[in-house]
A protein has these predicted regions:
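A generic secondary-structure micro-motif detector
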Residues: 33, 68-69
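Oxyanion-binding and handling regions
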Residues: 1-44, 48-55, 85-103
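DPxDG-like acidic metal-binding loop motif
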Residues: 59, 63-64, 70-88
Length: 103
């Protein structure tokens, strides 16, 4: 099971991680510019580090808040787009499904 972790709730940092067979690899990036310019390359870099493709993901886990409204929207929009394209669920940190599973 390969889980992508996204946390865009902070105004100061973005957290992107992978859980691969129970082992976590978390990257925290300070926000220097726009979150949208940082998050997608960060996801790509982390997937490549583990020789994974987006289609290898089985779930997306996201921090639904509280936090920066715009930051949360960015994270949820990216998670929603990936969920739709990859047909995988989006869950919050405790495993509760927060968006529908696309079929």
């Amino acid at each position: 099971m390969n889980i992508l972790i996204l946390d865009t709730s902070s105004n100061e940092k973005i957290t992107v991680g992978l859980v691969i067979n129970g082992k976590k690899d978390i990257r925290v990036e300070k926000i220097i510019s726009n979150k949208t310019q940082i998050i997608l390359p960060l996801i790509d870099k982390l997937l490549k580090k583990h020789s994974l493709k987006p289609y290898d993901l089985s779930e997306i886990q996201i921090n639904p808040g509280p936090g920066s409204f715009t930051g949360l929207r960015i994270g949820l929009a990216i998670a929603n787009a990936m969920s739709f394209a990859l047909k995988i669920p989006i869950n919050e940190e405790n495993g509760k499904i927060i968006l529908p599973i696309y079929s």
